[in-house]
Amino acid sequence: MSTIQPSAAFLYDRVQRLIPPIEWPAFAGDIDAILDLKRQRNAVILAHNYQTPEIFHCVADIVGDSLALARKAMSTEADVIVLAGVHFMAETAKLLNPQKTVLIPDLRAGCSLADSITAEDIRLLRQRYPGVPVVTYVNTSAEVKAESDICCTSGNAKAIVESLGVPRVIMLPDEYLAENIAAQTDVEIIAWKGHCEVHERFTPADIRQLRENHPGVIVLAHPECPPDVVAEADFSGSTAAMSDYVERQKPPRVVLLTECSMSDNVALQHPELEFIRPCNLCPHMKRITLANIRSALEQNRHVVTIEPGIAGRARLAVERMLAV
């Protein structure tokens, strides 16, 4: 273990099942620097479940799905928030912490869902469906949130839709999430045509092949997957719900139909279980690295700003969600 740098060595135990000792020195220097920079700047790192293990397990202070990160962002006492995730997540953290410095390590960390709809699209939808509330997935820009009545995540979408007490809602931008929620509620849902480039690639045939190759495997699917995939799965839920399912049920053999690193991170927490790992990478999440987290903290790079008129309205939509 002589290759392990001393001050980061205690963290290696968390990831040694995935990162060979020979590779650790490539990470350890950045990890040491990040830990020091966090102390110097009173900074906190919020990391989404899709971040790679060396980020998720070694430098992150708060981890979780979009809903968990939004809630935790509200209560942090740090002066600086680094969002190890994609841009809409950093914007949400800024909306909830307007007086704090929020950094995103790479400005190119976008989202296919967020790119699928604009504020003008929502204004046109409101003209077409006057009086129908707009429920917007948090996987959207601040401009889109500002045109919405309330936000939701994959973990609370059904509760949000039903909390409005109306017979019909517009739910955007994820078409598959909207269809999967529509199957669980009597509320009529008008959907948009956005898709997650990770989850839309899973198919029912994939599940059948997994079951054939790995008898007894329990299949967990994210609700951004197509409805026919969700129907073939044993369970569907947000990344937090999938993690909770594994923790609670302890399936001996399990597959998570979501982004690759989610399986890596949960598997590290459950070495007694067998994880089958079909790998659909999110290229946007993978733009976040230890090196650019370090640079963001060292140079105060990529400060997230939101135009005040947009921020106030977008914040209201997020706060309404958090109040449900």
Swiss-Prot record:
Compartments it resides in: Cytoplasm
Gene Ontology molecular function, alphabetical: 4 iron, 4 sulfur cluster binding; metal ion binding; quinolinate synthetase A activity
EC identifiers of the protein: 2.5.1.72
Cofactor note: Binds 1 [4Fe-4S] cluster per subunit.
Lineage: superkingdom: Bacteria
Cofactor(s) this protein cannot do without: [4Fe-4S] cluster
InterPro entries according to UniProt: NadA, NadA_sf, Quinolinate_synth_type2
GO cellular component terms listed in the entry, alphabetical order: cytosol
Enzyme category, top tier: transferase
Residues at which [4Fe-4S] cluster binds: 111, 196, 282
Pathway(s) it belongs to: Cofactor biosynthesis; NAD(+) biosynthesis; quinolinate from iminoaspartate: step 1/1
The reaction(s) this protein catalyses: iminosuccinate + dihydroxyacetone phosphate = quinolinate + phosphate + 2 H2O + H(+)
Known function: Catalyzes the condensation of iminoaspartate with dihydroxyacetone phosphate to form quinolinate.
Family label: Belongs to the quinolinate synthase family. Type 2 subfamily.
UniProt-recorded name of the protein: Quinolinate synthase 2
Source organism of this protein record: Mesorhizobium japonicum (strain LMG 29417 / CECT 9101 / MAFF 303099)
Lineage: Bacteria, Pseudomonadati, Pseudomonadota, Alphaproteobacteria, Hyphomicrobiales
Encoding gene, per UniProt annotation: nadA2
